[in-house]
């Protein structure tokens, strides 16, 4: 068995990543035990104890609840995906490059104000580089920008309410300007796009929207959304390769554990669709 711990399934990125990880069964023939961890460290530790009681051989972690130092103490092969991973092996997207591509496109499309919408990401988390790249690129090109890190919520509806509040603020604050909106993920981007359609019945020329992930919702939206494509299939495949290598090593008579964690970074691809010029 391999254990998987994900934060939730309402963000389309996580559900797509889970789909890709589960599809690796045909290559490796490992069965999976999956927990969704939304309620803090105590719950997650309980899940890990339960997974260990099933004698899992390895663990893939996407949630941010426990530190990599705590996770490394369990003494089993672990790979993190898109989270803080100082003490364990990991696979991440080059978040800086992805956000740089998105921000540059909005600048090239002559938006008057660039706005980034996200949660308040900790600096140790790889996705913080999306915020950093957005800010640094706007400053380099001397473009006015606004960073809103106020998104909070533990359900789709709670987050939608937050995005609605932010949309109202943007409408009031920047009424006569072309707005380039770069959102933390495709789920947020789809919510924002739907709010625009509810108000205007179309995507007006004074809005451009870019998401992040290229999860299925980006192409299924009312207008296909321009997005920074994380190569989710390659991330999942790389994570499985890293984990299985560690697990196979553990089975040897005298196993040699990794001297230090292995960190792999996957290049993102900007996918231009209908929400940018």
Roles of regions detected by a PLM:
Residues 168-180, 184-277:
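Flexible loop/turn connectors
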Residues 1-104, 172:
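Alpha-helical recognition/docking segments in bacterial nutrient-uptake
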Residues 25-36, 135-160:
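Short beta-strand elements in bilobed, periplasmic/extracellular small-molecule ligand-binding domains
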Residues 8-11, 38-39, 119-125, 152-155:
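Short histidine/acidic/glycine/proline-rich micro-motifs that form metal-
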Residues 102-149, 255-275:
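An alpha-beta-alpha
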Residues 91-116, 132-136, 158-168, 189, ...:
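Hydrophobic alpha-helical segments within soluble ligand-binding/sensing domains
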Residues 13-27, 98-101, 126-145, 191-195, ...:
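Short, solvent-exposed amphipathic alpha-helices that sit
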